[in-house]
Structures are given as structure tokens and as C-alpha cells.
Amino acid sequence: HKKDVLLTEHGIYTREREEEIIRAKWVVPSFKKQWIAFFYMLSDMIYQRAFRVTCLFTNAMRTQIQMGCAPGKCRVIENGIDYDRLSGIPLKEEDGWVDIGAVVRLAPIKDIKTMIYAFFELSAHVKNVRLHIMGGVDDEEYAQECYELVKQLKLENIIFTGRVDIVKYMEKLDFTILTSISEGQPLSVLESFAARRPCVTTDVGCCRELLEGKEEDVYGKAGYYVAPMYREGLADAMEKLCVSEPRRRRMGENAQNRVKTYYKHENMMENYRKVYREVEEKNGWNRI
């Protein structure tokens, strides 16, 4: 119909499918290359056809350009959250424990097993620590493996809560953790930041940028990042936050200021409106 196409990628779709196909045991090895090539063909077609292509962070835009998208089509529009809903959550009252939260689905891509092993190592050095894993089950078999691992390691201080009201539950937490193998721009980190909770993450997607800030950012570090599947690094990073309440408070303030400036829902909506107005203007202000 010769209509303009607007493409939004929260992750790099083709790269994510490539990772899944490479890992998939049920795909015949000789067919994997063909299937991956098919997704790259689709990616090239939509990049060529699109009027605008948006993504969540700068490195994702660089990848889109490397994959053949014209730089002039690309825009970065960050995720936005309801800042006011979370910013008033009080810091946890001192009770002799350090409580770590993980707002995460029980799925292999979230690498809950590495989180559990890292907490096991942390528990050898910090005794008064608890881990709250908050989220539903995406993969029942994987979830059962995680439950069994906790039993095998005799980790009584890991709590699987299921889905919770994150606004209410955040009051119980000192900081949060995310151990994903792949991410875009995780909302769970932004929500933690809005509530003045620093975060430990893996160095995937936009996590490093969220923790350290963009070039123009003046707020300072909001937590620590380590390589994916690096349990020792995760344990060390968690320990740094466990042993220093002033460090948690300072990084939490940095985190909240960063979200307030760059990642509010209102900012995101206005940036998308600008893209729609560009298309309207191109088409003589006719309907898209």
C-alpha cells in the first residue's frame, strides 16, 4: 500500500534469534546457517523499507547501522517509567539484614542459576544477607532446576516469592540484581533506580550505560556490572554493596537522579510523538 513503516526494536531482533538458533538442540545443525540467514534477510528488508528505525540505547543503534540500516533513519528513544509511582518508596528500615531483590522471570535467558551460585559464594562472606527472587515461571523445567539447586546448596535465605506488587515489595529491599545473558534496556533496573536502589547487573544490553550514565550524564555510578555468567564477579559486586550502607545510599541517589532526568514515561512518549510528527509532515499532515 506504499505506506511508511516505523520500526521499533527493543532488542536487536535478528541477533536474538541467531543466539536462540545457535543454542537450540532441536535444530538440525546443517539447517541452522540457512535459518539464521533467513532472519538476516528479513532484517535487511525492513531496514531498507522503514522510514524511521528506533531503538533503546546508543550501542543498539550502532549495531543496526552495522547491519545495514541507514544512519539517517535511526533514532534512540529510551524506555520510560512512571517515576512518581516509585520515587516515594522509603528506604528499607535497618533490621540487621541486607536484602537483595531480583525482579525476574524464571527463564534460562535470565540465568537464575548463576545468580544462585553467586549468592552461595556471597553467603560464605556475608552472613546476614537474603535474596528475594520475584517473578513468574516462564519455563517450568528450568524453574524446578533452580529450586533443586537452592536445596542442594542449602541456601535457606533465598526466597522465591512469585509475582508481587513491586511497589510494596521494594520497601523490603536494599538493592537489586540482574544476571541476564541478554537484555535490551531492562525496566526492572529503571524501577529499582527510581526507588533509590542501586543495582548489580551483567554487562548486557544497556546495563552499563544505565549504571554509569551517558556521555552528558553527571550523576555518577549507580551500581556495578560484570561479565555474563561470572559468578565470582557478581558475588564481589554484591558484597561491595552489602558491606557499605553509605555506598548503597550514594549510588541509590545517583540512580534516582538519572531516571528522573532521562527515563521518565513522559519523556519517552514525547520522543515517540516527534517521530510520528515527522511522518505526518512528510505526508503533508495526512493520516499515517
What is the predicted function of each stretch?
Residues 181:
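Aromatic "clamp/platform" in nucleotide-sugar-dependent glycosyltransferases that forms part
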Residues 81, 103, 130-144, 160:
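Glycosyltransferase donor-sugar binding loop
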Residues 143-163:
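Nucleotide-activated donor-binding/catalytic signature segment of Leloir-type glycosyltransferases, i.e.
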Residues 213-231, 240-245:
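Conserved acidic donor-binding segment of nucleotide-sugar-dependent glycosyltransferases
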Residues 198-201, 205-212:
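Short hydrophobic beta-strand element within catalytic cores of glycosyltransferases
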Residues 92-110, 116-119, 132:
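Conserved donor-binding/catalytic core segment of Leloir-type glycosyltransferases
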Residues 12-13, 32-53, 67:
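Membrane-proximal helix-turn-helix segments that form the acceptor-binding/catalytic region
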Residues 59, 80:
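Carbohydrate-associated surface elements
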